[in-house]
């Protein structure tokens, strides 16, 4: 099983390592796309140690114009974690202006968004409309949850507990594996 993670620029990025380590221990191969803003917040050397696949960014697409297509074809599942209001809005509105958003637009695989943002951003009417649009299209959301946010405030917007995230991903992987190599009429 191969999963493509799209990492966007949220402070919750620090929890991705736990998720990757657990999934890697279950022999799940992970590739990552790191957005421009995420690159400012994450240690790429540490990230590389927690995944078995490759790390991609906008720079890589300059050498391979089909990279967004190739990534969706070789992975079984696409997960955006942490998902910011920016990447949610881009996908909801069909904006494809970087590797992360063009890959989402090119994907025909199951897509999960795992949001993390301040409550004010999560509850914003435009953000909620975008989330609703995506859910109506069959995009799945894991979280967010209510609790203490990175900024110190308490509210809805915190990244879901990493154990819950990994359990839900494993459940989806198991569902996908049931139908692997099967032909349905």
Question: Across the structure, where does each feature detected by a protein language model lie?
Answer:
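N-terminal nucleotide-binding beta1-loop-alpha1 segment
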Residues: 184-185
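A cross-family phosphate/adenosyl-ligand binding-site feature
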Residues: 1-112, 118-181
């Amino acid at each position: 099983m191969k999963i493509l993670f799209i990492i966007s620029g949220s402070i919750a990025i620090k929890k991705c390592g736990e998720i990757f380590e657990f999934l890697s221990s279950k022999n799940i191969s992970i590739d990552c796309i790191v957005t421009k803003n995420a690159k400012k917040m994450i240690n790429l050397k540490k990230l590389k140690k927690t995944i078995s696949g490759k790390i991609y960014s906008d720079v890589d697409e300059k050498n391979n114009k089909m990279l967004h297509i190739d990534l969706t074809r070789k992975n079984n599942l696409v997960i955006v974690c942490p998902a910011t209001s920016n990447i949610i809005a881009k996908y909801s509105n069909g904006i494809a202006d970087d590797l992360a958003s063009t890959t989402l637009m090119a994907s025909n695989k199951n897509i999960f968004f795992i949001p993390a943002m301040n409550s004010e951003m999560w509850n914003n009417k435009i953000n909620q409309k975008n989330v609703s649009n995506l859910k109506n299209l069959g995009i799945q959301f894991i979280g967010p949850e209510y609790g203490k946010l990175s900024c110190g405030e308490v509210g809805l917007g915190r990244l879901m507990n990493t154990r819950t995230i990994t359990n839900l991903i494993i459940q989806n992987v198991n569902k996908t594996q049931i139908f692997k190599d099967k032909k349905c009429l």
